Amino acid sequence: MSGPTIAAEGVTNPPIDELLTKTDSKYKLVLYSAKRARQINAYYSQLGEGLLEYVGPLVDTHVQEKPLSIALREINEDLLTCEDVDPAELAAEEAAAQAAAADAGSSFSE
């Protein structure tokens, strides 16, 4: 009896092998997708409060679809990119932004 086969949704769709081509390692894929899933979850939580701090899903979603499944589909469709950040470079940018904010604040007080 061969009927239509139903593909499982979630972690197996999109396939892990396809997802691994989007990042350098499994570890990075896990961190990347988990962070995005938390953002999607926070977005849905904020909808009721009227706050929109986070960006909602970038793909069409289904009823009761889990945030991790949505995040994995976004990664697979190349709607998100993962870039490595040099901690020293990030600290220098933050220091420059704080210095610029301090300069702007001191010019208003004069």
Swiss-Prot record:
Keyword Disulfide bond part of the UniProt annotation: no
Cellular component aspect of the GO annotation: DNA-directed RNA polymerase complex
A GO BP annotation: DNA-templated transcription
EC number of the protein: 2.7.7.6
Stored NCBIfam families: rpoZ
Family: Belongs to the RNA polymerase subunit omega family.
Function statement: Promotes RNA polymerase assembly. Latches the N- and C-terminal regions of the beta' subunit thereby facilitating its interaction with the beta and alpha subunits.
Entries under HAMAP family matching the protein: RNApol_bact_RpoZ
Protein name: DNA-directed RNA polymerase subunit omega
Taxonomic placement: Bacteria, Bacillati, Actinomycetota, Actinomycetes, Propionibacteriales
Gene name of the encoded protein: rpoZ
